[in-house]
Swiss-Prot record:
It is an enzyme of class 2 (transferase). Catalyzes the conversion of uracil and 5-phospho-alpha-D-ribose 1-diphosphate (PRPP) to UMP and diphosphate. This is Uracil phosphoribosyltransferase. Belongs to the UPRTase family. One of its GO terms (molecular function) is uracil phosphoribosyltransferase activity. The gene is upp. Pathway: Pyrimidine metabolism; UMP biosynthesis via salvage pathway; UMP from uracil: step 1/1.
């Protein structure tokens, strides 16, 4: 297992616009959805296909299709929903889990307030989404919870990651692949990724 940085030019271009402090809430939200489409392509690159019989205008054939119902997108609330929307546009048959966590600004530790997931997650691929992998505490807590429910096939998708968060996360869950658009320099004293883009949830919902 490892860490994949999605360096596609479109991803990097859109990420740069999102980083700019003058980017509006509406533009930030739109760009996050657009990037999620591109990141989803990468994280689902090796999904298994099955075949189904169809008829084209010319003849019958057995055609490849994705078994979308075997896929779960797990959003770490609230910012994860910004990535979730675009991914569901691509895979509308996927199931959805919501994991409510917020970071205590004094201890930087995650506090859980909500968890809802499909009951039959044991045999499904679960892609956990959260724009930021900063300290890593929230991502670790979310995946701890999913594993408690029996999940064994999990991937983590984020927009930005800090080296400290990646180290902590991969030590806690070495079996979970990480996909990100950028690994930034470091965390500051408040646990924010720098240079980063600020608080993704606040910028997405205009609550900063």
């Amino acid at each position: 297992m490892g860490v994949t940085v999605v360096s596609h030019p479109l991803v990097q271009h859109k990420l740069t616009i999102m980083r700019k402090k003058e980017t509006s809430t509406a533009s930030f939200r739109r760009l996050l959805k657009e990037i999620s489409l591109l990141l989803c392509y990468e994280v689902t690159r090796d999904l298994e296909l099955t075949t189904m019989p169809i008829e084209t205008p010319l003849m019958p054939m057995d055609a490849p299709v994705l078994e979308g119902k075997k896929l779960v997108f797990a959003s770490i609330l609230r910012a994860g929903n910004g990535l979730l929307e675009g991914m569901l546009d691509l895979v509308p048959a996927a199931r959805v889990a919501h994991i409510g966590l917020y970071r205590d600004h004094d201890t930087l530790q995650p506090v859980e307030y909500y968890f809802k997931a499909p009951e039959d997650i044991v045999n499904r691929l679960i892609i956990v989404v959260d724009p930021m992998l900063a300290t890593g505490h929230s991502a670790i807590a979310a995946i701890d919870k999913l594993k408690e429910r029996g999940a064994t096939n999990i991937r983590f998708l984020c927009l930005l990651a800090a080296p400290e968060g990646i180290k902590r996360f991969t030590e806690a869950h070495p079996d979970v692949d990480v996909f990100t658009a950028s690994i930034d320099e470091r965390l500051d004293e408040k646990g924010y990724i720098v240079p980063g883009l600020g608080d993704a949830g606040d910028r997405m919902y205009g609550t900063k």
